[in-house]
Curated annotation (Swiss-Prot):
Species in which this protein is naturally found: Bacillus subtilis (strain 168)
Protein name according to UniProt: Probable tartrate dehydrogenase/decarboxylase
Gene3D superfamilies xrefs: Isopropylmalate Dehydrogenase (3.40.718.10)
Highest rank taxon of the organism: Bacteria
SMART domains: Iso_dh
Keyword Lyase: yes
Keyword check for Mitochondrion: no
Family: Belongs to the isocitrate and isopropylmalate dehydrogenases family.
């Protein structure tokens, strides 16, 4: 068997990012041992708020070029407002990477994890993925402000291109082929006059190329409500930048803790490496205490394996994670008493027994 080695740029970042990235790397190395035919090489970069205080920037001038030499970027968490204002840390590192590596698609799975209590009374074993357009839409910089006082006006333009809209929809349909063959479109064409009817048209045209996939369209207000009342009915949801942002925050909450929510930022062309990061922040208040939940970062590592074409190995990691949480080996944020290291070590131990 030819040994495959994946070269990964690791950016632990701030706060608990350092702890959870180390935990996920340990799980990946263990998974590689179990697999026997692949390995992971991590190159760590110290880009963080501490780096900013020393160098006056969140990353060096050639930082993006450096990242292009790797097959993926594995990021922990960014931000510490006591050291650096959030807008500087966010735009100087995380958003800079997303934009310059053309990470136009954001993917966030959500499922009812065994042993973790959802805030829903009857969660009914939901398992879905939100695919969010990550490069344009409502979060454009087109617009402006004029006048002051009673005549003051702020104009914010949303930008929807056919290229980006069709790209995110095709990604969603291709993913649905590997899952339960259903795609839901998040729209608001009954209230947004131009952009959402365009979105609906592109969705219908794209769906015509995927005869085996069932489709539905839901207005964002109703869809947000359905996430709460019947999340088990969804498979793949495709959404614009703003709508996807809203839906993914709801989906993280449904799982019981933002600490277990994973995320992937994908360059669908493969021109540049994709970036994988958990949804949670840097949580500086608990950093260094062994309280951080490693599940979000480890699940994010599973998404990276899927991206590398190692879906079977990724599925094993997810299965073992659920076995561990089902047996009550959990951090405090999800009702347990275990430390970061104890959860990580238990996952590794069970992987070795496969």
């Amino acid at each position: 068997m030819t040994m495959k080695q994946f070269e990964i740029a690791a950016i632990p970042g701030d706060g608990v990012g350092k702890e959870v990235v180390a935990a996920a790397e340990k799980v990946l190395h263990t998974a590689a041992e179990v697999h026997g035919g692949l390995s992971f090489s991590f190159t760590a970069f110290p880009w963080s708020c501490d780096y900013y205080l020393e160098h006056g920037k969140m990353m060096p001038e050639d930082g993006i070029h450096t990242l292009t030499q790797f097959e993926a970027v594995f990021l922990g968490a960014v931000g510490n407002p006591k050291l650096v204002p959030d807008h500087i840390s966010l735009w100087g590192l995380l958003l800079k990477i997303r934009r310059e590596l053309e990470l136009s698609i954001n993917m966030r799975p959500a499922k009812q994890m065994a042993g973790i209590t959802s805030p829903l009374l009857h969660p009914n074993d939901f398992d879905f993925v939100v695919i969010r357009e990550n490069s344009e839409g409502e979060y454009s910089e087109v617009g402006g402000r004029i006048h002051r006082g009673d005549d003051e006006i702020a104009i914010q333009n949303a930008v929807f291109t056919r290229k980006a809209t069709e790209r995110v929809m095709r990604f969603a349909f291709e993913l649905a082929k590997k899952r339960r063959s259903h795609v839901t479109s998040a729209t608001k064409s009954n209230g947004i006059y131009h952009a959402m009817p365009f979105w609906d048209e592109v969705f219908q045209q794209t769906a015509a190329d995927y005869s085996g996939i069932e489709t539905s369209s839901q207005h964002i207000d109703a869809l947000a409500a359905f996430f709460v009342t019947r999340p088990e009915t969804f498979d793949v949801i495709v959404a614009s930048n703003l709508f996807g942002d809203i839906l993914t925050d709801i989906s993280s909450s449904l799982m019981g803790s933002i600490g277990i929510a994973p995320s992937a930022n994908i360059n669908p062309s493969g021109k540049y490496p994709s970036m994988f990061e958990p949804v949670h922040g840097s949580a500086p208040d608990i950093a260094g205490q062994g309280l951080a939940n490693p599940i979000g970062q480890i699940w994010t590592a599973k998404l990276m394996l899927d991206h590398f074409g190692e879906e079977e190995l990724g599925a094993k990691i997810l299965d073992v994670m659920e076995q561990v949480t089902a047996d009550g080996i959990k951090t405090r944020d999800i009702g347990g008493q275990s430390t970061t290291a104890e959860v990580t070590d238990e996952i590794c131990s069970r992987l070795r027994k496969l």
